[in-house]
């Protein structure tokens, strides 16, 4: 994200402060959202959050699709990055508080600890594949301006930089649908076991 913002919004962009938007929104909203979803199942809360993730990525993609800056003194790239991060933080508020609860409910009695340990496998895999994919996409759609002789040549090469976010929106949508299917399948299996 920092390289994308600096390359698209310019060297004067300061993406460091944008990273603070996520924890700010989470701290402000997690209690309210947790209370709001308290009567719902953990999987329902998680699914709401999972379907917010692709919306977040699509908002981030809108940054260089908009015309003139919407807010004076702030590039649309920065504005839409903030909007996307806000939605992503809201998704986190729906997912995180109920995530471990859901995994512990899936575990057979006495194996909760092992299941909770494996619940973090996604973080490990996403850090490997996500960072690699981000680097490949950044190189393809938003290359380093230093590699070009003119600003115009770089602008032509990075004209579709927003495509990066479409990949992440697609991954988020696939993950949301996969979680929904997983919940339906495990619910069906659990019903058969009770019969």
Q: Regions from the language model: what does each represent?
A:
Residues 136-173:
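A membrane-interface helix-boundary motif in multi-pass transporters
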Residues 5, 93-108:
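Intracellular juxtamembrane helix-capping segments at the cytosolic ends
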Residues 12-13, 78-79, 104-122:
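Loop-to-transmembrane helix entry/capping segments in MFS-fold secondary transporters
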């Amino acid at each position: 994200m920092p390289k994308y913002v600096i390359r698209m919004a310019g060297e004067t962009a300061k993406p460091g402060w944008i990273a603070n938007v996520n924890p700010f929104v989470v701290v402000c909203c997690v209690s309210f959202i947790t209370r709001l979803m308290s009567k719902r199942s953990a999987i329902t809360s998680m699914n709401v959050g999972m379907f917010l993730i692709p919306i977040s990525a699509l908002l981030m993609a809108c940054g260089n699709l908009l015309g003139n800056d919407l807010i004076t003194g702030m590039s649309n790239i920065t504005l839409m990055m903030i909007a996307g991060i806000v939605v992503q933080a809201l998704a986190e508020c729906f997912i995180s508080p109920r995530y471990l609860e859901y995994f512990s409910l899936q575990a057979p009695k006495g194996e909760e600890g092992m299941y909770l340990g494996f619940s973090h496998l996604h973080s490990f895999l996403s850090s490997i594949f996500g960072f690699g994919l981000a680097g490949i996409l950044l190189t393809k759609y938003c290359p380093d301006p230093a590699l070009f002789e003119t600003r115009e040549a770089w602008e032509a090469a990075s004209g579709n930089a927003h495509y990066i976010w479409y990949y992440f929106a697609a991954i988020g949508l696939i993950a949301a649908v996969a979680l929904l299917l997983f919940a339906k399948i495990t619910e069906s299996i659990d019903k058969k076991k009770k019969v």
